[in-house]
Amino acid sequence: MSRINREEFARLMQQRVLVLDGAMGTCIQGYNLTPDDFLGGKGNNDILNLTSGDVIEAIHRAYVAAGADIIETNTFSGNAISQKDYGMENRVREINLKGAQIARKVADEAGRKVLVAGSMGPTSKSLSLSPDASDPGFRPYS
């Protein structure tokens, strides 16, 4: 396993620029995935860790082959608030664990030091912005 501590990470960053992978969601769009792959919740890319792990693994491998030093887990929306939109809030732990395992496997098999970073995006809810463009004053919370 290619785990490093904070000091080693700082040393690596002083030696050279570390390359982070690119957009997971954009790459996913290039695959012919069906609603079944998303368990009916098209757009829930994180659930693909469970249903189409081979696709996520292939994307990670492509980024490593392109020279990425750091790959991010496919867990951008892996939180209970965002997953509730798809009825998957009870699978958050499973989604995140599998996402980390897939990335870790690819990093370990890279033949060079590749780091894994956990990806944590915002939730699908906003207190400061209206989710409805036609009603900018609307807030889903009172």
Question: How would you name each of these model-derived features?
Answer:
Residues M1-S142:
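Domain-level signal for soluble alpha/beta catalytic cores
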